[in-house]
Amino acid sequence: MSVRLVLAKGREKSLLRRHPWVFSGTVARMEGKASLGETIDIVDHQGKWLARGAYSPASQIRARVWTFDPSESIDIAFFSRRLQQAQKWRDWLAQKDGLDSYRLIAGESDGLPGITIDRFGNFLVLQLLSAGAEYQRAALVSALQTLYPECAIYDRSDVAVRKKEGMELTLGLVTGELPPALLPIEEHGMKLLVDIQHGHKTGYYLDQRDSRLATRRYVENKRVLNCFSYTGGFAVSALMGGCSQVVSVDTSQEALDIARQNVELNKLDLSKAEFVRDDVFKLLRTYRDRGEKFDVIVMDPPKFVENKSQLMGACRGYKDINMLAIQLLNEGGILLTFSCSGLMTSDLFQKIIADAAIDAGRDVQFIEQFRQAADHPVIATYPEGLYLKGFACRVM
């Protein structure tokens, strides 16, 4: 008999709506014993089968659902089916947009909770973020090797969230050849260098692909400030869009060095690109005090909020930084501002920008809205999958 997680009476509603998480507060008891990440059956208080998922005793998310089909086993064949299903959409997208790199698996939205897989050319970069994903590592890797024999697999499960589920961080080659220090990829006509082994996340922010492209429509003959620039994707896109100057700001000199290489790789005018190592909050205040002005500002900060207790502080941070940006824009200037914090809703983010505009003493029009690129889908039953949101704002 399988191990069963029994829900308290009336706590099955989210599973009946096919939400993939079971929170600890909904659980009545366990029947049997399961190890960290092991597959268990989830039943209601009367014993009716609801789902099959991965058990995580140390997490507030006590189980993550693999399947709502009682006949489906969690094995190599299961992962092969999920991968093939996800690949169909990415194949179409890659052909339409001329991509050689994309998110192959977007966790829960692709039916594989806690699993992120990005493809960069012939390298698959793996992040296993949950106990269940780690427990199924061997089956997943086996499925990947069969479906993608041409690809090397590199593990970037070096993320702090693993510690919340009692797991160590892991990093290194799984199969195949080691990725080069900087791997060139192509995106909307740009060549960009990706540091798979040591870069942020899996090496590059694929989710901002379409936002980088959208930037080009606003920048012709404009002076652009690119905040939290990382390796310069927005800067390269701005130069391709015909900007007169782009200033990229980041705290990492290594990232700025790669940004410079990316400009050179695309044979763009390096004299129009400036790279500044500094704290963005501090530099924006310095620019304001000096009377500096820009026509377009890209504001793409890292995640400010990890949990609900940090949300109010994050709101203040987002408001302050957007207020400073609005103050630096010429009349008719464009602010492209983003939040990658999952707990920050689009409505709340829009209100924060409106409040920032009031504090800056400027009127702002919302003219365009952004979200993560189409290879980062959001399944309808898991709205939490929509984590990246952004706005193009015209400052009056």
Curated annotation (Swiss-Prot):
Keywords: Cytoplasm, Methyltransferase, RNA-binding, rRNA processing, S-adenosyl-L-methionine, Transferase. GO terms for cellular component: cytoplasm. It is an enzyme of class 2 (transferase). Pfam families: Methyltrans_SAM, PUA_3. It comes from the Bacteria. It is found in: Cytoplasm. Coiled coil: none annotated. Residues 2-81 form the PUA domain. Its main location: cytoplasm. It catalyses: cytidine(1962) in 23S rRNA + S-adenosyl-L-methionine = 5-methylcytidine(1962) in 23S rRNA + S-adenosyl-L-homocysteine + H(+). PROSITE patterns: PUA (PS50890). PANTHER family: RIBOSOMAL RNA LARGE SUBUNIT METHYLTRANSFERASE, S-ADENOSYLMETHIONINE-DEPENDENT METHYLTRANSFERASE DOMAIN-CONTAINING PROTEIN. Specifically methylates the cytosine at position 1962 (m5C1962) of 23S rRNA. Belongs to the methyltransferase superfamily. RlmI family. This is Ribosomal RNA large subunit methyltransferase I.
